[in-house]
């Protein structure tokens, strides 16, 4: 079975998100330029969203309860270690991947379940929310880097045409 095209878009988006923070020092990752969050908080926040949408809603599991508390929507901005949140992000995305690989258009059209009850969103809506959310925070992270005086920043959107070109789902 071929991977769903939205999963290809997510994989590309994840790579671009991580490309945007490549080379950032531990010191710069925790700096806050108000009202923005720190770059490291943004990484933890996307780890939270992937864990919630793809592990909790998709598979009924949570790898990092602390991530679920510290980086949830509306949680206060903090300055966590970049190493800590990147490790959690890698673990969470790795755990999500097998489930994502099996997604079909039919599954994407079904409502997600939390605590035994359907929620308002389909798995497809949640997948799109994650993709778009990544791009929002990729832009925010680039703005943080510009404000910190970083130069030679990556240009976006990378190699989309080769890495994640449009293709129909069937």
What are these regions (language model features)?
Residues 22-29, 105-108:
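Short, flexible helix-adjacent loops and helix caps
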Residues 8-12, 103-106:
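An acidic intrinsically disordered interaction segment
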Residues 74-114, 121-136:
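Acidic/histidine-rich alpha-helical segments that form the ligand environment
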Residues 10, 14, 21, 89, ...:
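Hydrophobic alpha-helical core bundles mediating ligand binding, dimerization, or RNAP-core interactions
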Residues 7-11, 18, 26-72, 114-170:
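Short, contiguous alpha-helical
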Residues 1-6, 75-77:
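Short, charged, low-complexity loops and linkers
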